[in-house]
Amino acid sequence: MPVTKSLSKLQKNLSKKGKNITVHPKGRKYEKLVRATMREDKIAAKKKLHQDKRVHELARVKFMQDVVNSDTFKGQPIFDHAHTREFIQSFIERDDTELDELKKKRRSNRPPSNRQVLLQQRRDQELKEFKAGFLCPDLSDAKNMEFLRNWNGTFGLLNTLRLIRINDKGEQVVGGNE
């Protein structure tokens, strides 16, 4: 008989056995339920982590697309790494006004609000990544720029976009999806 790992299938199989049966805490069926529950929790946590990573990547690319499609840069076909560095800095500093406002609003003897802590942690993490190499679309390639300008904002087409890593000095660092 095949081993069932899915929690829903396991629960369904147990309910088929008979009327409302109780499972002994040290029994074989209970251990199966515990393993299946732990497995479901682990899979859900990995899915959430992966989804969060994709959302952050999508936000970066969308920000770059908005900058590139703005009226100021509409006619420029490609950008060098120095321009890309400036765009990344503006992306990292996008919440600085709200962060400063939250710091001013907070009284001196009170702990920071959850929103302030969240914004500060995100900013610190992005700055740390920027020093090592910030993952962003390659704006120095004409084909990539054309694709970025016409990108519809979906996850599926994001894989065809060439990404590179730019550090805080404006140099390309080894990495990305090249």
Swiss-Prot record:
Similarity-based family: Belongs to the TMA16 family.
Disulfide bonds: none
InterPro entries according to UniProt: Tma16 (IPR021346), Tma16_sf (IPR038356)
Keywords: Nucleus
Protein name: Translation machinery-associated protein 16
Pfam families in UniProt: Tma16 (PF11176)
Record's miscellaneous remark: Present with 5350 molecules/cell in log phase SD medium.
Highest taxon of source: Eukaryota
Compartment(s) of residence: Nucleus
Designated gene of the protein: TMA16
Gene source species: Saccharomyces cerevisiae (strain ATCC 204508 / S288c)
GO CC, one annotated term: nucleus
